[in-house]
Every structure is written in structure tokens, then in C-alpha cells.
């Protein structure tokens, strides 16, 4: 989920694919969440459930099972079946548990801290990617100023709009491409039809 740090409210929640990259967070869920975060100047925090298919009770049982199988190992060597290798050092640091602590000495409170880290992995958003990297942008000509049947401007005769020129943006998944194709085709056909309807110059 994504939440505003200033207004203390959740602005978006979804289930789907997310990527940890060298520059930050990406993936379909983040692209959709960014549509909400881009409209405000307040700081945001993304809270990620790293094991969304497991509720807390089931996840705790899973952790106990993994710990039982690795009770004589160091904590840092007990999570390979639970988390991707690159995530393990980060999750350990967030949990506050000594990576060299033996698994058989980990307390219930420490296990709870690990569970909470996995179920609510917080990432503060420091900045947004530059507009040059955007998949789609918000803003543009108000749709109330455009004839939806022709895509012609209601304010300027003979002027047509399509795609991202319009103040229309949708979640990722091909919707923005469909908007561009559909409005572009309609605008082109409408402009051509209007041109052919012009009376011929008198000779």
C-alpha cells in the first residue's frame, strides 16, 4: 500500500508484481500507485507485504518450521527458503536481530519483529522518476472541452485532440494505449470527414 506521510492516510492498495531495482521500486503495482502519489507534493511511504499469500498466523508457523530445520545455524543462514537471497540482509537489518545469533536462541519477541518486517516492509519515497521515464503523464486538455463523438475542441473549431493531449490517464495494463489508439482514430476520421464536407470553391 502507499500512504501519505503528511496526511497520515492510505492513498492506494493493490496486489500484484513489484520489482526492487538499482534505482528504487518499479513494476505494475508501483506504476499504478504513482498515479496517486504524483498528484500530491506530500511525502509518501510504500508498505510492502513480502508474503501476501500468508496471513500472520500461517507465516509465523512457516518461520517456526524453518527455524526448527536450522536451529543450530546463524540467523543469517536460516532464511534462504523464505526470502530471495538479495532481500535477506535487508530484512535482517530491519528486524533488529543479530545476523550471527543462533536460531535456537531467538526469542518469541524477535520472531515477531521478523514477521512484522516481512508483512510490512516500509520504503519511504525519496523522489519520483523523471518525466522522461514516465509510461503516461497526467494533465492536459479537459475532456469537458472536447466533443466525445468527434474529439473536436468545443472552444476552437477544427482543432482535434487525442491520446496524452487529453487530461486522461489510466492504470498500467494497456488502457492508456487503447485510449491513444481509439481517440486518435476518432480524431483522424472526424477531421477527414469534416474536410470532405467543405464546399468546393466557386470557379
Regions found by a protein language model. Give the residues of each.
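Predominant activation on well-ordered alpha-helical scaffold segments within soluble catalytic domains
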Residues: 30-31, 112-115, 119, 181-189
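A conserved FAD-binding loop/helix module that cradles the flavin
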Residues: 168-196
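An anion/pyrophosphate-binding glycine-rich loop and adjacent beta-alpha core
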Residues: 4-105
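Gly/Ser/Thr-rich beta-alpha loop segments that engage phosphate groups in nucleotides
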Residues: 26-29, 141-142, 165, 172-176
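Domain-scale detector for complete catalytic domains at protein termini or as standalone homologs
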Residues: 45, 75-81, 87, 126-127, ...
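A glycine-rich dinucleotide-binding beta-alpha-beta segment and adjacent secondary-structure elements
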Residues: 89-169
Amino acid at each position: 500500500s502507499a500512504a501519505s506521510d503528511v496526511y497520515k492516510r492510505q492513498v492506494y492498495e493493490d496486489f500484484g508484481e513489484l520489482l526492487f531495482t538499482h534505482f528504487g521500486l518499479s513494476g505494475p503495482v508501483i506504476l499504478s500507485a504513482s498515479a496517486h502519489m504524483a498528484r500530491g507534493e506530500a511525502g509518501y511511504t510504500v508498505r510492502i507485504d513480502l508474503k501476501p499469500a500468508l496471513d500472520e498466523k500461517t507465516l509465523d508457523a512457516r518461520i517456526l518450521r524453518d527455524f526448527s530445520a536450522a536451529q543450530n545455524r546463524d540467523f543469517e543462514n536460516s532464511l534462504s527458503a523464505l526470502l530471495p537471497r538479495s532481500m535477506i540482509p535487508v530484512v535482517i537489518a530491519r528486524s533488529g536481530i543479530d545476523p550471527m545469533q543462533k536460531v535456537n536462541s531467538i526469542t518469541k519477541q524477535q520472531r515477531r519483529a521478523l514477521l512484522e518486517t516481512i508483512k510490512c516492509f516500509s520504503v519511504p519515497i525519496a523522489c519520483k522518476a523523471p518525466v522522461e521515464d514516465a509510461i503516461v503523464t497526467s494533465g492536459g486538455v479537459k475532456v469537458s472541452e472536447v466533443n466525445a463523438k468527434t474529439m473536436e475542441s468545443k472552444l476552437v473549431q477544427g482543432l482535434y485532440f487525442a491520446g496524452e493531449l487529453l487530461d486522461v490517464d489510466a492504470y498500467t495494463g494497456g488502457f492508456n494505449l487503447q485510449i491513444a489508439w481509439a481517440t486518435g482514430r476518432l480524431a483522424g476520421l472526424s477531421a477527414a470527414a469534416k474536410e470532405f464536407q467543405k464546399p468546393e470553391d466557386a470557379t
